[in-house]
């Protein structure tokens, strides 16, 4: 039995969240009655309202009047008044991933998982399948520039979704094709141990049906170990590793992007195939690896080499993934969502490859718990930055932790050998600090999952105002 058409209204608590908004948009486009609430106004809330979805700002029991089902994310606390009212009225409550799983049952599905790179890889898979006239439905964890949204309803048989592992609910997703980009220590507040994280990813791959396949990056040691433990599912490996089934070769930086080729070797058939002259308008080895995963899926689904080349060259990227927000006196300002040490290191390396000038990192640590659990890694991931400007920790609802703050992070970076680290007093001071450090040809890279994106977009204008 699939999600009945008469179900509704479907009420989303926290409808403006990036994961929730995409599901709500697709359900609305399918003809379901959707409503919701959110703590504040946002671009996502406004976009959904334009589609005719009724959205309340603020959470209160009356908002759920008439709802047949409540959809909640893990960000919603157990004492939320709408959640309490739904349970008192015996209205079914489902997690975000459960509703996403219901949508996935309507199509054949590609689900992209991994500690980093999910959103970009999801966008790349969508772009390639779109170019191949497969017209996929897409639900992503970031705004796809080509769509201007994080979701679209396609008319084809395929759906492409980002599988968020943060609370373990990605194991509910019925994927026919699974991608695993990498597995690093993250979301330990939920999983408690890194072993539990690895077990979850193994289960994610083993959930793929026998007629499907998984695409896994064996450049990553943990993923390679997982590949060795999975016996009864078809695996296509990728990476620069010479043992990869889809091998990234001849990677070179070019005009702010990358050029490379991908060589395929079919272990069963003993055949080889190469797609050369690939151009990606994004810098960095990490993005080329993400593209290789997407190419592996597209190749397996029968897309032609020429279609893959054209789609990749035209890829418009994802908002908050190495996004240029402006320039000032020859200085380029970049906004990036990177908030884990592995992501930060990859982004700064891409910036280093993109300019002959200095790389100046502006970092807003995201969550006290993440900074605490990965403190050593944070103190060693800024090696490609000539200078690091450190803002206060963005709490994301967490209470402060003693000894885990901006100033201790600054001391940690210096103790680990970084030569130029500046403590930022507040966002209003950023333009003045940058103006004192940056010269023509330099890159200023704003990093974090909090409100630093607003600083990145305001910074070019604030610098110009300084003269």
Curated annotation (Swiss-Prot):
Pfam families: Mur_ligase (PF01225), Mur_ligase_C (PF02875), Mur_ligase_M (PF08245). One of its GO terms (molecular function) is UDP-N-acetylmuramate-L-alanine ligase activity. InterPro entries: Mur-like_cat_sf (IPR036565), Mur_ligase_C (IPR004101), Mur_ligase_C_dom_sf (IPR036615), Mur_ligase_cen (IPR013221), Mur_ligase_N (IPR000713), MurCDEF_pg_biosynth (IPR050061), UDP-N-AcMur_Ala_ligase_MurC (IPR005758). Keywords: ATP-binding, Cell cycle, Cell division, Cell shape, Cell wall biogenesis/degradation, Cytoplasm, Ligase, Nucleotide-binding, Peptidoglycan synthesis. It catalyses: UDP-N-acetyl-alpha-D-muramate + L-alanine + ATP = UDP-N-acetyl-alpha-D-muramoyl-L-alanine + ADP + phosphate + H(+). ATP binds at residues 114-120. Its main location: cytoplasm. One of its GO terms (cellular component) is cytoplasm. Pathway: Cell wall biogenesis; peptidoglycan biosynthesis. GO terms for biological process: cell division; cell wall organization; peptidoglycan biosynthetic process; regulation of cell shape. The keyword Ligase applies. Gene3D superfamilies: Mur ligase, C-terminal domain (3.90.190.20), Mur-like, catalytic domain (3.40.1190.10), NAD(P)-binding Rossmann-like Domain (3.40.50.720). It is found in: Cytoplasm. The keyword Ligase applies. Its EC number is 6.3.2.8. Belongs to the MurCDEF family. Cell wall formation. This is UDP-N-acetylmuramate--L-alanine ligase. The lineage of its organism: Bacteria, Pseudomonadati, Pseudomonadota, Alphaproteobacteria, Hyphomicrobiales.
